UniProtKB/Swiss-Prot annotation:
One of its GO terms (biological process) is action potential. This is Potassium voltage-gated channel subfamily A member 2. The record marks 252 as: Important for normal, slow channel gating. Keywords: Cell junction, Cell membrane, Cell projection, Endoplasmic reticulum, Glycoprotein, Ion channel, Ion transport, Lipoprotein, Membrane, Palmitate, Phosphoprotein, Potassium, Potassium channel, Potassium transport, Synapse, Synaptosome, Transmembrane, Transmembrane helix, Transport, Voltage-gated channel. Inhibited by 4-aminopyridine (4-AP). Inhibited by dendrotoxin (DTX) and charybdotoxin (CTX), but not by tetraethylammonium (TEA). Inhibited by tityustoxin-K alpha (TsTX-Kalpha), a toxin that is highly specific for KCNA2. Inhibited by maurotoxin. Inhibited by kappaM conotoxins kappaM-RIIIJ and kappaM-RIIIK. Residues 1-27 are annotated as: Disordered. Glycans are attached at residue 207. Homotetramer and heterotetramer with other channel-forming alpha subunits, such as KCNA1, KCNA4, KCNA5, KCNA6 and KCNA7. Channel activity is regulated by interaction with the beta subunits, including KCNAB1 and KCNAB2. Identified in a complex with KCNA1 and KCNAB2. Identified in a complex with KCNA5 and KCNAB1. Interacts with the beta subunit KCNAB1. Identified in a complex with KCNA4 and FYN. Interacts with PTK2B. Interacts (via C-terminus) with CTTN. The cytoplasmic N-terminus is important for tetramerization. Interactions between the different subunits modulate the gating characteristics. Besides, the cytoplasmic N-terminal domain mediates interaction with RHOA and thus is required for RHOA-mediated endocytosis. The transmembrane segment S4 functions as a voltage-sensor and is characterized by a series of positively charged amino acids at every third position. Channel opening and closing is effected by a conformation change that affects the position and orientation of the voltage-sensor paddle formed by S3 and S4 within the membrane. A transmembrane electric field that is positive inside would push the positively charged S4 segment outwards, thereby opening the pore, while a field that is negative inside would pull the S4 segment inwards and close the pore. It comes from Canis lupus familiaris. A motif (PDZ-binding) lies at residues 497-499. It comes from the Eukaryota.
Protein backbone atom coordinates (compact mmCIF):
# COMPACT_ATOMS: atom_id res chain seq x y z
CA UNK A 1 0.00 0.00 0.00
CA UNK A 2 1.40 3.35 -1.06
CA UNK A 3 1.02 6.30 1.25
CA UNK A 4 1.19 9.80 -0.28
CA UNK A 5 2.49 12.55 1.94
CA UNK A 6 0.97 15.97 2.09
CA UNK A 7 4.20 17.79 1.25
CA UNK A 8 4.06 19.79 -1.91
CA UNK A 9 6.16 18.56 -4.75
CA UNK A 10 8.34 21.67 -4.78
CA UNK A 11 9.06 21.42 -1.05
CA UNK A 12 9.90 17.74 -1.34
CA UNK A 13 12.30 18.46 -4.17
CA UNK A 14 14.02 21.15 -2.07
CA UNK A 15 14.68 18.81 0.85
CA UNK A 16 18.23 17.47 1.29
CA UNK A 17 18.78 14.11 -0.38
CA UNK A 18 16.28 14.77 -3.17
CA UNK A 19 17.99 15.41 -6.51
CA UNK A 20 16.71 18.39 -8.41
CA UNK A 21 16.12 17.69 -12.13
CA UNK A 22 16.66 20.80 -14.22
CA UNK A 23 14.89 21.02 -17.56
CA UNK A 24 16.50 23.02 -20.33
CA UNK A 25 14.04 23.54 -23.20
CA UNK A 26 16.73 24.88 -25.55
CA UNK A 27 19.01 21.90 -25.01
CA UNK A 28 16.13 19.50 -25.52
CA UNK A 29 15.15 21.38 -28.67
CA UNK A 30 18.66 21.12 -30.08
CA UNK A 31 18.79 17.45 -29.19
CA UNK A 32 15.56 16.61 -30.97
CA UNK A 33 15.89 19.08 -33.85
CA UNK A 34 15.47 17.36 -37.17
CA UNK A 35 17.12 18.00 -40.50
CA UNK A 36 15.87 17.09 -43.97
CA UNK A 37 18.31 15.84 -46.60
CA UNK A 38 17.19 15.75 -50.22
CA UNK A 39 19.13 13.31 -52.42
CA UNK A 40 18.14 13.97 -56.06
CA UNK A 41 14.49 14.34 -55.08
CA UNK A 42 14.39 11.60 -52.42
CA UNK A 43 13.98 13.17 -48.98
CA UNK A 44 15.49 11.73 -45.79
CA UNK A 45 14.76 13.06 -42.30
CA UNK A 46 16.86 12.50 -39.22
CA UNK A 47 17.89 14.23 -36.00
CA UNK A 48 20.87 16.56 -35.76
CA UNK A 49 22.28 14.61 -32.83
CA UNK A 50 22.52 11.58 -35.13
CA UNK A 51 24.69 13.46 -37.59
CA UNK A 52 26.70 15.08 -34.80
CA UNK A 53 28.16 11.70 -33.83
CA UNK A 54 30.74 12.15 -36.60
CA UNK A 55 31.62 15.86 -36.60
CA UNK A 56 34.49 15.44 -39.07
CA UNK A 57 32.22 14.24 -41.87
CA UNK A 58 30.35 16.34 -44.42
CA UNK A 59 26.94 15.93 -42.77
CA UNK A 60 28.28 16.02 -39.22
CA UNK A 61 30.03 19.38 -39.60
CA UNK A 62 27.54 22.31 -39.63
CA UNK A 63 29.88 24.50 -41.68
CA UNK A 64 30.43 21.86 -44.33
CA UNK A 65 26.78 20.91 -44.78
CA UNK A 66 25.69 24.57 -44.79
CA UNK A 67 27.21 24.91 -48.25
CA UNK A 68 24.50 22.60 -49.56
CA UNK A 69 21.62 24.12 -47.57
CA UNK A 70 18.56 25.30 -49.50
CA UNK A 71 16.90 28.10 -47.46
CA UNK A 72 13.78 28.12 -49.65
CA UNK A 73 12.88 24.52 -48.86
CA UNK A 74 14.73 24.42 -45.54
CA UNK A 75 16.65 21.28 -46.50
CA UNK A 76 20.09 20.06 -47.52
CA UNK A 77 20.19 19.20 -51.19
CA UNK A 78 22.62 16.83 -52.96
CA UNK A 79 22.66 15.59 -56.53
CA UNK A 80 24.13 12.22 -55.61
CA UNK A 81 23.37 8.53 -55.90
CA UNK A 82 20.12 7.87 -54.06
CA UNK A 83 20.47 4.13 -53.21
CA UNK A 84 23.87 4.80 -51.65
CA UNK A 85 22.51 7.32 -49.15
CA UNK A 86 20.53 4.61 -47.36
CA UNK A 87 23.82 3.06 -46.29
CA UNK A 88 25.40 6.47 -45.61
CA UNK A 89 22.56 7.50 -43.31
CA UNK A 90 22.64 4.13 -41.56
CA UNK A 91 26.33 4.76 -40.92
CA UNK A 92 25.32 7.71 -38.72
CA UNK A 93 22.36 5.93 -37.14
CA UNK A 94 24.28 2.78 -36.23
CA UNK A 95 27.33 4.57 -34.89
CA UNK A 96 29.76 3.57 -37.62
CA UNK A 97 28.51 0.45 -39.38
CA UNK A 98 28.90 0.69 -43.15
CA UNK A 99 27.59 -1.83 -45.66
CA UNK A 100 27.26 -1.34 -49.41
CA UNK A 101 23.78 -1.89 -50.87
CA UNK A 102 23.69 -4.82 -53.29
CA UNK A 103 22.34 -2.65 -56.11
CA UNK A 104 25.17 -0.10 -55.92
CA UNK A 105 28.46 -0.76 -57.78
CA UNK A 106 31.72 -0.71 -55.86
CA UNK A 107 33.21 2.29 -57.61
CA UNK A 108 30.09 4.42 -57.14
CA UNK A 109 29.82 3.60 -53.45
CA UNK A 110 33.52 4.39 -52.98
CA UNK A 111 32.94 7.79 -54.56
CA UNK A 112 30.02 8.41 -52.21
CA UNK A 113 32.16 7.57 -49.18
CA UNK A 114 34.76 10.06 -50.31
CA UNK A 115 32.17 12.72 -51.10
CA UNK A 116 30.51 12.52 -47.68
CA UNK A 117 33.98 12.49 -46.10
CA UNK A 118 33.37 9.49 -43.89
CA UNK A 119 37.10 9.17 -43.40
CA UNK A 120 39.91 6.72 -44.01
CA UNK A 121 38.72 4.35 -41.28
CA UNK A 122 35.29 3.99 -42.88
CA UNK A 123 36.89 3.41 -46.28
CA UNK A 124 39.18 0.70 -44.88
CA UNK A 125 36.24 -0.93 -43.10
CA UNK A 126 34.25 -0.92 -46.34
CA UNK A 127 37.15 -2.40 -48.30
CA UNK A 128 37.70 -5.16 -45.75
CA UNK A 129 34.00 -5.96 -45.81
CA UNK A 130 34.14 -6.25 -49.60
CA UNK A 131 37.10 -8.62 -49.42
CA UNK A 132 39.77 -6.21 -50.64
CA UNK A 133 43.32 -7.16 -49.79
CA UNK A 134 45.11 -4.44 -47.88
CA UNK A 135 47.81 -2.82 -49.95
CA UNK A 136 51.33 -2.75 -48.63
CA UNK A 137 52.90 0.58 -47.89
CA UNK A 138 55.74 1.48 -50.23
CA UNK A 139 57.82 4.12 -48.44
CA UNK A 140 60.35 6.35 -50.18
CA UNK A 141 63.80 7.34 -48.88
CA UNK A 142 63.93 10.55 -46.87
CA UNK A 143 67.11 11.80 -48.53
CA UNK A 144 66.34 13.66 -51.74
CA UNK A 145 69.23 12.16 -53.73
CA UNK A 146 68.41 8.63 -52.57
CA UNK A 147 64.75 9.21 -53.39
CA UNK A 148 65.59 10.24 -56.95
CA UNK A 149 67.88 7.24 -57.43
CA UNK A 150 65.29 4.90 -55.91
CA UNK A 151 62.59 6.19 -58.23
CA UNK A 152 64.99 5.89 -61.14
CA UNK A 153 65.68 2.17 -60.61
CA UNK A 154 62.54 0.97 -58.79
CA UNK A 155 59.73 2.84 -60.57
CA UNK A 156 60.27 2.58 -64.35
CA UNK A 157 57.29 4.78 -65.18
CA UNK A 158 58.25 7.68 -62.93
CA UNK A 159 60.32 9.51 -65.56
CA UNK A 160 61.95 9.27 -68.97
CA UNK A 161 65.42 8.27 -67.69
CA UNK A 162 63.77 5.60 -65.52
CA UNK A 163 62.16 4.13 -68.64
CA UNK A 164 65.53 4.06 -70.40
CA UNK A 165 67.11 2.22 -67.47
CA UNK A 166 64.21 -0.24 -67.45
CA UNK A 167 64.62 -0.89 -71.19
CA UNK A 168 68.37 -1.46 -70.76
CA UNK A 169 67.69 -3.84 -67.86
CA UNK A 170 65.15 -5.82 -69.89
CA UNK A 171 67.54 -6.05 -72.85
CA UNK A 172 70.36 -7.32 -70.61
CA UNK A 173 68.04 -9.93 -69.08
CA UNK A 174 66.95 -11.13 -72.52
CA UNK A 175 70.56 -11.28 -73.77
CA UNK A 176 71.54 -13.30 -70.70
CA UNK A 177 68.68 -15.77 -71.21
CA UNK A 178 69.39 -16.14 -74.94
CA UNK A 179 73.07 -16.72 -74.20
CA UNK A 180 72.16 -19.32 -71.58
CA UNK A 181 70.09 -21.22 -74.14
CA UNK A 182 72.47 -20.89 -77.12
CA UNK A 183 75.51 -22.17 -75.26
CA UNK A 184 73.84 -25.59 -74.97
CA UNK A 185 73.69 -26.06 -78.76
CA UNK A 186 75.92 -28.90 -80.03
CA UNK A 187 77.97 -26.54 -82.19
CA UNK A 188 78.91 -24.47 -79.13
CA UNK A 189 79.12 -27.25 -76.54
CA UNK A 190 82.41 -29.11 -76.07
CA UNK A 191 82.44 -32.71 -75.06
CA UNK A 192 83.73 -33.54 -71.60
CA UNK A 193 87.11 -34.97 -72.52
CA UNK A 194 90.75 -34.38 -71.63
CA UNK A 195 92.83 -32.48 -74.12
CA UNK A 196 96.58 -32.79 -73.85
CA UNK A 197 98.81 -30.39 -75.66
CA UNK A 198 101.88 -28.33 -74.94
CA UNK A 199 102.26 -29.81 -71.48
CA UNK A 200 98.99 -28.21 -70.39
CA UNK A 201 96.01 -30.33 -69.30
CA UNK A 202 92.54 -28.93 -69.95
CA UNK A 203 89.19 -30.08 -68.58
CA UNK A 204 85.92 -28.87 -70.03
CA UNK A 205 82.96 -28.11 -67.81
CA UNK A 206 79.68 -27.43 -69.52
CA UNK A 207 80.58 -24.87 -72.20
CA UNK A 208 83.82 -23.60 -70.63
CA UNK A 209 87.28 -25.02 -71.25
CA UNK A 210 89.38 -24.74 -68.11
CA UNK A 211 93.16 -25.04 -68.16
CA UNK A 212 95.11 -25.60 -65.05
CA UNK A 213 98.19 -23.73 -66.22
CA UNK A 214 96.60 -21.47 -68.77
CA UNK A 215 92.82 -21.01 -68.87
CA UNK A 216 91.04 -20.37 -72.14
CA UNK A 217 87.53 -20.01 -70.69
CA UNK A 218 88.01 -16.27 -70.18
CA UNK A 219 88.18 -15.79 -73.95
CA UNK A 220 84.95 -17.69 -74.54
CA UNK A 221 82.34 -15.35 -76.13
CA UNK A 222 79.61 -16.73 -73.88
CA UNK A 223 81.76 -16.05 -70.83
CA UNK A 224 82.34 -12.48 -71.98
CA UNK A 225 78.61 -11.92 -72.56
CA UNK A 226 77.83 -13.45 -69.18
CA UNK A 227 80.42 -11.23 -67.50
CA UNK A 228 78.98 -8.08 -69.05
CA UNK A 229 75.47 -9.06 -67.95
CA UNK A 230 76.66 -9.79 -64.41
CA UNK A 231 78.40 -6.41 -64.26
CA UNK A 232 75.09 -4.69 -65.04
CA UNK A 233 73.11 -6.88 -62.63
CA UNK A 234 75.62 -6.24 -59.84
CA UNK A 235 75.65 -2.50 -60.47
CA UNK A 236 71.84 -2.38 -60.48
CA UNK A 237 71.61 -4.44 -57.30
CA UNK A 238 74.17 -2.34 -55.40
CA UNK A 239 72.55 0.95 -56.44
CA UNK A 240 69.16 -0.33 -55.30
CA UNK A 241 70.60 -1.49 -52.00
CA UNK A 242 72.27 1.82 -51.13
CA UNK A 243 69.22 3.86 -52.21
CA UNK A 244 66.52 1.72 -50.59
CA UNK A 245 64.53 3.25 -47.69
CA UNK A 246 64.95 0.16 -45.49
CA UNK A 247 68.00 -2.09 -45.61
CA UNK A 248 66.28 -4.79 -43.55
CA UNK A 249 63.18 -4.81 -45.74
CA UNK A 250 65.33 -4.86 -48.87
CA UNK A 251 66.33 -8.50 -48.36
CA UNK A 252 62.77 -9.60 -47.60
CA UNK A 253 61.56 -8.51 -51.02
CA UNK A 254 61.17 -11.48 -53.33
CA UNK A 255 62.40 -9.46 -56.32
CA UNK A 256 65.67 -8.64 -54.59
CA UNK A 257 66.12 -12.30 -53.64
CA UNK A 258 65.73 -13.17 -57.33
CA UNK A 259 68.42 -10.60 -58.14
CA UNK A 260 70.80 -12.25 -55.67
CA UNK A 261 70.05 -15.71 -57.06
CA UNK A 262 70.75 -14.41 -60.57
CA UNK A 263 74.18 -13.04 -59.60
CA UNK A 264 75.63 -15.60 -57.17
CA UNK A 265 76.03 -18.57 -59.61
CA UNK A 266 78.47 -16.61 -61.75
CA UNK A 267 80.81 -15.83 -58.86
CA UNK A 268 80.59 -19.38 -57.48
CA UNK A 269 81.42 -20.83 -60.88
CA UNK A 270 84.26 -18.36 -61.38
CA UNK A 271 85.69 -19.07 -57.94
CA UNK A 272 85.47 -22.82 -58.50
CA UNK A 273 87.32 -22.59 -61.79
CA UNK A 274 90.05 -20.34 -60.42
CA UNK A 275 90.54 -22.48 -57.30
CA UNK A 276 90.92 -25.71 -59.27
CA UNK A 277 94.39 -27.25 -58.93
CA UNK A 278 96.08 -29.89 -61.13
CA UNK A 279 96.71 -32.28 -58.23
CA UNK A 280 92.99 -32.26 -57.35
CA UNK A 281 91.91 -33.26 -60.83
CA UNK A 282 91.06 -36.85 -60.11
CA UNK A 283 88.16 -38.42 -61.90
CA UNK A 284 85.85 -38.54 -58.87
CA UNK A 285 86.45 -34.95 -57.85
CA UNK A 286 86.11 -33.84 -61.46
CA UNK A 287 82.71 -35.50 -61.74
CA UNK A 288 81.60 -33.97 -58.45
CA UNK A 289 82.74 -30.49 -59.53
CA UNK A 290 80.98 -30.94 -62.84
CA UNK A 291 77.72 -31.88 -61.10
CA UNK A 292 77.95 -28.91 -58.73
CA UNK A 293 78.67 -26.51 -61.57
CA UNK A 294 75.74 -27.82 -63.57
CA UNK A 295 73.37 -27.29 -60.65
CA UNK A 296 74.72 -23.79 -60.07
CA UNK A 297 74.45 -22.91 -63.74
CA UNK A 298 70.91 -24.25 -63.78
CA UNK A 299 69.99 -21.59 -61.23
CA UNK A 300 70.72 -19.01 -63.92
CA UNK A 301 67.42 -19.89 -65.56
CA UNK A 302 65.62 -18.17 -62.67
CA UNK A 303 67.01 -14.95 -64.08
CA UNK A 304 63.93 -14.82 -66.27
CA UNK A 305 61.90 -13.85 -63.21
CA UNK A 306 63.77 -10.53 -63.20
CA UNK A 307 61.44 -9.55 -66.02
CA UNK A 308 58.58 -9.41 -63.52
CA UNK A 309 60.05 -6.16 -62.16
CA UNK A 310 59.22 -4.54 -65.49
CA UNK A 311 56.06 -6.50 -66.37
CA UNK A 312 52.68 -5.69 -64.84
CA UNK A 313 51.29 -8.98 -66.11
CA UNK A 314 53.87 -11.07 -64.26
CA UNK A 315 53.36 -8.99 -61.12
CA UNK A 316 49.60 -9.58 -61.29
CA UNK A 317 50.20 -13.30 -61.78
CA UNK A 318 52.54 -13.43 -58.79
CA UNK A 319 50.11 -11.52 -56.58
CA UNK A 320 47.31 -13.85 -57.68
CA UNK A 321 49.29 -16.96 -56.80
CA UNK A 322 50.29 -15.43 -53.47
CA UNK A 323 46.68 -14.60 -52.60
CA UNK A 324 45.50 -18.05 -53.76
CA UNK A 325 47.97 -20.12 -51.74
CA UNK A 326 45.18 -21.60 -49.64
CA UNK A 327 43.23 -22.72 -52.70
CA UNK A 328 46.36 -24.07 -54.36
CA UNK A 329 47.19 -25.97 -51.19
CA UNK A 330 43.72 -27.52 -51.18
CA UNK A 331 44.13 -28.44 -54.85
CA UNK A 332 47.43 -30.20 -54.19
CA UNK A 333 45.94 -31.95 -51.16
CA UNK A 334 42.96 -33.23 -53.18
CA UNK A 335 45.27 -34.38 -55.98
CA UNK A 336 47.45 -36.18 -53.44
CA UNK A 337 44.45 -38.06 -52.06
CA UNK A 338 43.27 -38.93 -55.58
CA UNK A 339 46.71 -40.16 -56.62
CA UNK A 340 46.91 -42.47 -53.61
CA UNK A 341 43.39 -43.86 -54.14
CA UNK A 342 43.49 -44.42 -57.89
CA UNK A 343 47.07 -45.69 -58.06
CA UNK A 344 46.17 -48.29 -55.44
CA UNK A 345 42.94 -49.17 -57.24
CA UNK A 346 44.58 -49.57 -60.65
CA UNK A 347 47.39 -51.67 -59.16
CA UNK A 348 45.00 -54.20 -57.68
CA UNK A 349 42.78 -54.08 -60.77
CA UNK A 350 45.78 -54.98 -62.96
CA UNK A 351 47.43 -57.37 -60.46
CA UNK A 352 46.27 -60.54 -62.26
CA UNK A 353 47.39 -59.29 -65.67
CA UNK A 354 50.66 -60.91 -66.72
CA UNK A 355 51.78 -57.95 -68.86
CA UNK A 356 50.65 -55.29 -66.41
CA UNK A 357 52.34 -51.90 -66.69
CA UNK A 358 51.78 -51.23 -62.98
CA UNK A 359 54.32 -53.37 -61.09
CA UNK A 360 53.78 -51.44 -57.84
CA UNK A 361 51.67 -48.68 -56.33
CA UNK A 362 54.51 -46.09 -56.43
CA UNK A 363 55.00 -46.88 -60.13
CA UNK A 364 51.29 -46.12 -60.64
CA UNK A 365 51.65 -42.62 -59.09
CA UNK A 366 52.83 -41.20 -62.42
CA UNK A 367 49.83 -42.68 -64.25
CA UNK A 368 47.41 -41.29 -61.64
CA UNK A 369 48.94 -37.79 -61.86
CA UNK A 370 48.81 -37.56 -65.67
CA UNK A 371 45.29 -39.00 -65.68
CA UNK A 372 43.87 -36.65 -63.04
CA UNK A 373 45.43 -33.64 -64.77
CA UNK A 374 43.89 -34.87 -68.07
CA UNK A 375 47.32 -35.01 -69.75
CA UNK A 376 47.34 -38.73 -70.54
CA UNK A 377 50.74 -39.45 -72.12
CA UNK A 378 49.77 -43.04 -72.88
CA UNK A 379 53.06 -44.49 -71.67
CA UNK A 380 51.17 -46.46 -68.99
CA UNK A 381 47.66 -47.72 -69.75
CA UNK A 382 45.37 -50.24 -68.05
CA UNK A 383 44.38 -53.26 -70.13
CA UNK A 384 41.74 -55.00 -68.01
CA UNK A 385 38.11 -53.93 -67.72
CA UNK A 386 38.53 -53.10 -64.05
CA UNK A 387 41.62 -51.02 -64.79
CA UNK A 388 39.82 -49.07 -67.51
CA UNK A 389 36.92 -48.34 -65.15
CA UNK A 390 39.38 -47.07 -62.55
CA UNK A 391 41.07 -44.95 -65.22
CA UNK A 392 37.75 -43.41 -66.27
CA UNK A 393 36.86 -42.55 -62.68
CA UNK A 394 40.35 -41.12 -62.19
CA UNK A 395 39.98 -38.78 -65.17
CA UNK A 396 36.52 -37.61 -64.07
CA UNK A 397 37.66 -37.04 -60.48
CA UNK A 398 40.65 -35.09 -61.76
CA UNK A 399 38.47 -32.74 -63.80
CA UNK A 400 36.21 -32.06 -60.81
CA UNK A 401 39.12 -31.63 -58.42
CA UNK A 402 40.90 -29.10 -60.61
CA UNK A 403 37.71 -27.20 -61.49
CA UNK A 404 36.66 -26.51 -57.89
CA UNK A 405 39.34 -23.94 -56.84
CA UNK A 406 39.64 -22.35 -60.28
CA UNK A 407 36.82 -19.75 -59.78
CA UNK A 408 38.48 -18.44 -56.61
CA UNK A 409 41.83 -18.09 -58.37
CA UNK A 410 40.17 -16.35 -61.33
CA UNK A 411 38.37 -14.00 -58.93
CA UNK A 412 41.68 -13.06 -57.30
CA UNK A 413 43.23 -12.48 -60.70
CA UNK A 414 40.35 -10.20 -61.73
CA UNK A 415 40.70 -8.24 -58.50
CA UNK A 416 44.43 -7.60 -58.93
CA UNK A 417 43.99 -6.86 -62.63
CA UNK A 418 41.27 -4.27 -62.02
CA UNK A 419 43.26 -2.79 -59.14
CA UNK A 420 46.28 -2.25 -61.37
CA UNK A 421 44.23 -0.77 -64.21
CA UNK A 422 42.30 1.40 -61.76
CA UNK A 423 45.57 2.66 -60.30
CA UNK A 424 46.76 3.66 -63.77
CA UNK A 425 43.52 5.53 -64.46
CA UNK A 426 43.62 7.31 -61.10
CA UNK A 427 47.22 8.44 -61.56
CA UNK A 428 46.30 10.89 -64.29
CA UNK A 429 47.40 14.48 -64.47
CA UNK A 430 44.89 16.41 -62.39
CA UNK A 431 44.40 20.06 -63.32
CA UNK A 432 41.55 22.34 -62.23
CA UNK A 433 40.92 25.18 -64.69
CA UNK A 434 37.32 26.13 -63.97
CA UNK A 435 38.26 29.29 -62.05
CA UNK A 436 41.53 31.21 -61.58
CA UNK A 437 40.79 31.68 -57.88
CA UNK A 438 41.06 27.97 -57.14
CA UNK A 439 44.36 27.58 -55.29
CA UNK A 440 46.91 25.34 -56.90
CA UNK A 441 48.13 22.32 -55.00
CA UNK A 442 51.48 20.65 -55.53
CA UNK A 443 49.83 17.30 -54.91
CA UNK A 444 47.87 17.73 -58.12
CA UNK A 445 50.97 17.63 -60.29
CA UNK A 446 51.00 13.92 -60.76
CA UNK A 447 51.76 12.65 -64.21
CA UNK A 448 49.90 9.84 -65.83
CA UNK A 449 53.11 7.90 -66.02
CA UNK A 450 53.15 7.46 -62.23
CA UNK A 451 51.08 4.30 -62.38
CA UNK A 452 52.84 2.91 -59.31
CA UNK A 453 50.97 5.32 -57.07
CA UNK A 454 49.03 3.60 -54.29
CA UNK A 455 45.38 4.09 -53.54
CA UNK A 456 46.18 5.82 -50.27
CA UNK A 457 48.23 8.38 -52.19
CA UNK A 458 45.40 8.86 -54.63
CA UNK A 459 42.93 9.45 -51.82
CA UNK A 460 45.25 12.13 -50.42
CA UNK A 461 45.31 13.79 -53.84
CA UNK A 462 41.53 13.56 -54.07
CA UNK A 463 41.24 15.06 -50.59
CA UNK A 464 43.48 17.91 -51.71
CA UNK A 465 41.17 18.58 -54.65
CA UNK A 466 38.14 18.58 -52.36
CA UNK A 467 39.83 20.93 -49.90
CA UNK A 468 40.73 23.29 -52.73
CA UNK A 469 37.14 23.29 -53.93
CA UNK A 470 35.86 23.86 -50.39
CA UNK A 471 38.11 26.89 -49.90
CA UNK A 472 36.94 28.29 -53.19
CA UNK A 473 33.27 27.72 -52.38
CA UNK A 474 33.57 29.52 -49.06
CA UNK A 475 35.11 32.45 -50.89
CA UNK A 476 32.40 32.23 -53.50
CA UNK A 477 29.72 32.60 -50.84
CA UNK A 478 31.27 35.92 -49.82
CA UNK A 479 32.19 37.41 -53.19
CA UNK A 480 29.93 35.65 -55.70
CA UNK A 481 32.31 36.72 -58.49
CA UNK A 482 33.14 33.32 -59.92
CA UNK A 483 31.07 30.30 -60.91
CA UNK A 484 32.15 26.79 -60.09
CA UNK A 485 30.93 24.04 -62.35
CA UNK A 486 29.76 21.63 -59.72
CA UNK A 487 26.24 20.26 -59.67
CA UNK A 488 26.55 19.26 -56.03
CA UNK A 489 26.88 22.87 -54.91
CA UNK A 490 24.02 25.29 -54.33
CA UNK A 491 24.94 28.97 -54.55
CA UNK A 492 22.98 30.47 -51.66
CA UNK A 493 23.98 34.04 -52.59
CA UNK A 494 22.56 33.68 -56.08
CA UNK A 495 19.38 32.05 -54.77
CA UNK A 496 18.72 34.86 -52.32
CA UNK A 497 19.38 37.43 -55.04
CA UNK A 498 16.84 35.80 -57.33
CA UNK A 499 14.24 35.88 -54.56
Amino acid sequence: MTVATGEPADEAAALPGHPQDTYDPEADHECCERVVTNISGLRFETQLKTLAQFPETLLGDPKKRMRFFDPLRNEIFFVRNRPSFDAILYYYQSGGRLRRPVNVPLDIFSEEIRFYELGEEAMEMFREDEGYIKEEERPLPENEFQRQVWLLFEYPESSGPARIIAIVSVMVILISIVSFCLETLPIFRDENEDMHGGGVTFHTYSNSTIGYQQSTSFTDPFFIVETLCIIWFSFEFLVRFFACPSKAGFFTNIMNIIDIVAIIPYFITLGTELAEKPEDAQQGQQAMSLAILRVIRLVRVFRIFKLSRHSKGLQILGQTLKASMRELGLLIFFLFIGVILFSSAVYFAEADERESQFPSIPDAFWWAVVSMTTVGYGDMVPTTIGGKIVGSLCAIAGVLTIALPVPVIVSNFNYFYHRETEGEEQAQYLQVTSCPKIPSSPDLKKSRSASTISKSDYMEIQEGVNNSNEDFREENLKTANCTLANTNYVNITKMLTDV
